[in-house]
Amino acid sequence: MTGAKTNQVDQRPLSITDLLHFIPYDLQQTFLFEAILSYGKIYNLYPIKWVFLIALALFEIGSLICGAAPSSVGLIMGRVVAGIGSGGLFAGAILLVAEFKPLNERAFYNGMLGAMYSVASVAGPLMGGAFTERVTWRLCFYINLPLGVVTAVIVFLLVPNNYDSGRDSRRGLPLKKKLQEMDLYGLVVLVPTIICILLATQWGGTKYSWGNARIIALFVVGFVLFVAFVVIEIWQGDRAIVPPSLVKRRTVWACSIFSFCLFGSFLVVAYFLPLWFQAIKGDTATESGIHNLPSILGTTIFSVAAGGMVFGLGYYTWACILGSVLAAVGAGLLSTLEVDSNAAKWIGYQVLYGAGCGFGLNQPLIAIQAALPDFQKSEGTAVVIFMQTFGGTIAIAVAQNVFNNKLVSNILAAGIPVDPAALLSVGATKLQGLVQPQFFGRLQLAYNDSITQTFYVAVATAGLSMAGSILIPWLSVKQAVAPEDAETANTVMPFQHPSSDVDLAMPAILRQSGEIASEDSQSSDIEKVPRNNEVSTYDSQTSEVEKSSVGSTNRKVESIRN
């Protein structure tokens, strides 16, 4: 359970600042971002099973260090180790499913994975708050140990050792060549880039004004470093940690935009809605978790339901679009919450918002599986998860700025005799003790307005996610091929039946018969025969398939199959 962050090694209850800093800039977060992209390469170079188990071991070691930390330095180091390990866990789980299940069945299983991920994102911090208040903050980390052991035993016993040994030819490279494949130059430049961006978004408007020289300098340096990172990636080519050939794909960048925005919206609601229950309804951390169940259940149920519907219909783009719409509407309704809002409102709004996130959050990972060939799936998965995580971090930082600034201005405008800094440093459940009884009603109104303002950030990011969702190609997960350029070779109109196996195999058939020029005369045409004797056609966007008669085609199909 990494959601609960403890800024000081003590037994005090979580303050508002603590809660807002569950996903802030710190050393662990930077290493987490680095690790996510690194694992995209590592999973291509080494067997998925063993990489996953090593990542899990690092996460467990980091959790143990955090739980036993005698000082803040030890806690930070433990978080770094845990972050390096956790960066490979979700991507590894997705890739393990991809290895054992055909494309059309992955939607359902990935839906269940996404549901558990969403539940953990919401429930983890709330459980951490309860542990901190009632037991000890160390339990936030110790609880990971038995759960990790059970996971490791299951993976070790049930996943074969050499099931994916032929997945990527680069696995046979010597260690020196594998290190060159890791794009160390890009990784080194990416670290300060992330630090500058996160510091600027976290400090701007709170610790320093947006026009402060420090904030401007951070943005300028971050931009320059980002440009340098892009240049390095272009120079590295396919060795890059984010290969340019991958970024050029419409599915990858559209899914990245969608994931960045929708997950950012999801985390804003996940972390500020419990504050509303604690400050406005007087809940404890545990009670706010119970009142947050409609959101958790909505996300979980509709994530699994969306996976089943994608499995049945064959398409996932519709779920992304619907998810964006429902999430934006749900977040908008949450922004209307008042001090006296009844249970029917906050339950209904949560269910609607949870449905939107459930429908949409997991679909980009299905899109990556459908649109990319095997050798790019791990890198594509890592890029989408990176953008998802980074989007959540940026959205939380922006929402925190909105909350802090609005609360201070509301306190001053209402003439409430309380120090805003002191208000931000105590727990949301301790508000009543800060002011005299006659001022508490005004304080609640100020607090309610400040929290609901953060939901506008969730509305905006959910709305922006629609730009990505409508650009995701309509591909079918029911087709038996995974072309390298599926976005053009295998795109059909929504809800049409997929092409027959003869139609899908046409490019390979014609090439083998000599009716289409060889690879040397075409623009990046690649052919690959995947597992289970499936015919896979890889067509570039510029190549065109020549027509042939049905009778001739059928004879060639039979000849090839025999």
UniProtKB/Swiss-Prot annotation:
**What membrane topology does the UniProt entry give?**
Multi-pass membrane protein
Main localization is: membrane
Gene Ontology terms describing biological process: transmembrane transport
- GO function terms (MF aspect): transmembrane transporter activity
The cross-references to Gene3D superfamilies, in alphabetical order and at most eight, read: MFS general substrate transporter like domains, Multidrug resistance protein D
Function of the protein:
MFS-type efflux pump; part of the gene cluster that mediates the biosynthesis of elsinochrome C, a perelyenequinone phytotoxin structurally similar to cercosporin.
| Protein's recorded name | MFS-type efflux pump elcC
